[in-house]
Amino acid sequence: MIYLHAIDPIAFSLGPVQVHWYGLMYLAAFFSAWALGRSRILRGRLPGVDMDGFSDLLFYGMLGVVLGGRIGYMLFYAFETFLANPLILFKVWEGGMSFHGGLLGVLIACWLWARKHRLHFFDVMDFVAPLVPLGLGFGRLGNFVGGELWGKFTQAGWGVIFPHAPELADRLPAQIQAQYAAGALNQFARHPSQLYEAALEGVVMFVVLWTFSMKPRARYAVSGLFALLYGVFRFIVEFVRVPDAPIGYLAFNWLTMGQILSLPLIAVGLVLLAMSRRAPVLQPVLPAPAGVEAAK
């Protein structure tokens, strides 16, 4: 059944402050990363690091996601807008985050943290990779609730009509409701590409990576699998997703910026998986109990 998107992006209000679902999804993403990371730390999957160290890593990662995601969006998708008004970089409440920018931010943050703690960078990345997919899924759910980043038109029975899409922008909400009830808007149904990404980049990637990382793996393997899966899934979904308005298609009337940025991830993933064939395996070392650590 074709669905009319009518979700209020505002979850609730606290006086004059409006709390958006998108912000709550970010909180859910960081909480899931903390809970999953805690489980891995307690099983000794990052030797030499306790919960205090992991909390520090999570803080670095949060900064990397927010700063990298915002800067990446401006550079990759809204560069001309940024040049015209550089202060727009700080208007995060207006939306605009890039996964690829956020990934770059996390890589830099993890590199700094690994250097600070004298750990191998890819041991840290292999630890972090399984914590990320659920956060990606929450982010895509936030995109869906906000009615943004929709897909192309579809005749599929699960299509979604987005009232804020350009083809309906001149119609009043009451008109849209009446026309939807009469079945007069079915030709405007779109692929819920946000939900496709939530399922693939969130649920499927989490199940695969978490299961794969349950056993000790060779260095580079988990990171490589993450990069490969994300690159492939994102490249595929881009075929049914509307390209970003300021850019459109970059070549062949189908190649998008998201696909171009995903190709290096696929290549890096394959290289890392190949490197893992001759790399050492990091064996778990359970962290010392808090009381023992304090006695030292």
UniProtKB/Swiss-Prot annotation:
The lineage of its organism: Bacteria, Pseudomonadati, Pseudomonadota, Gammaproteobacteria, Lysobacterales. Pfam families: LGT. It is a multi-pass membrane protein. Coiled coil: none annotated. This is Phosphatidylglycerol--prolipoprotein diacylglyceryl transferase. One of its GO terms (cellular component) is plasma membrane. The chain crosses the membrane at residues 10-30, 57-77, 92-112, 119-139, 194-214, 220-240, 254-274. It comes from Xanthomonas euvesicatoria pv. vesicatoria (strain 85-10) (Xanthomonas campestris pv. vesicatoria). NCBIfam families: lgt. It is an enzyme of class 2 (transferase). It is found in: Cell inner membrane.
